[in-house]
Amino acid sequence: MKSYGAEFLGTFWLVLGGCGSAVLAAGFPNLGIGFAGVALAFGLTVVTMAYAIGHISGCHLNPAVSIGLWAGGRFPAGQLAPYIVAQVLGAIAAGAVLYVIASGGAGFDVAKGFASNGYAEHSPGGYSLLAALVCEVVMTMFFLLVIMGATDKRAPAGFAPLAIGLALTLIHLISIPVTNTSVNPARSTGVALFVGGWAVQQLWLFWLAPIIGAVLGAKVYRLIAGESE
């Protein structure tokens, strides 16, 4: 139960910190943190939680990561369902808190997106469904490659949180214009439910693509690195 609670809290922090920075701070007049600031915020949530709860749950914070680690032989199948439930509930709870905070500001309109992920007319840069699919698969594949490598027993000790957090920052820098960056089905779900409509209709992609990418990343890592000692 402790690990499930840790995943709930960790995913809550990721959504509140990452999506919160996008909704509340990215475009703040004169002092907005902008595109790069949002990317950094997502990375910082992972770094901070990895040090805080990594020793409790492994700090997955992401159904695709849990599934990828299972595919890579690093996580038991029996733990997948409760981990994913905890992650999704944490993301939804964070979305609710963020909605309450954001709705207290002048001019807030959840229909503007609320940091939701999307493609076609709902892509920040107008990217197609195919472009969004490829982007999310490839970004999540490399995210799992970094996670698998950084947490390998053969890797330098103590640096995994930094490597993983920086990888997530880089992923956001690349893909925010394409999909608003998911690579995390829980993160996508936690805000899409409050937007409704198109955000929920397009949510399927942000479950399917990250999971495919995560499994590919784990399998590729096993192929090139072999078994950990």
Curated annotation (Swiss-Prot):
Pfam families recorded: MIP (PF00230)
Keywords: Cell inner membrane, Cell membrane, Membrane, Repeat, Transmembrane, Transmembrane helix, Transport
Principal localisation: membrane
Annotated SUPFAM superfamilies: Aquaporin-like
Position of sequence motif NPA 1: 62-64
Presence of keyword Ribosomal protein: no
Site (Involved in tetramerization or stability of the tetramer): C19
HAMAP family: Aquaporin_Z (MF_01146)
Protein name: Aquaporin Z
Organism: Chromobacterium violaceum (strain ATCC 12472 / DSM 30191 / JCM 1249 / CCUG 213 / NBRC 12614 / NCIMB 9131 / NCTC 9757 / MK)
Lineage: Bacteria, Pseudomonadati, Pseudomonadota, Betaproteobacteria, Neisseriales
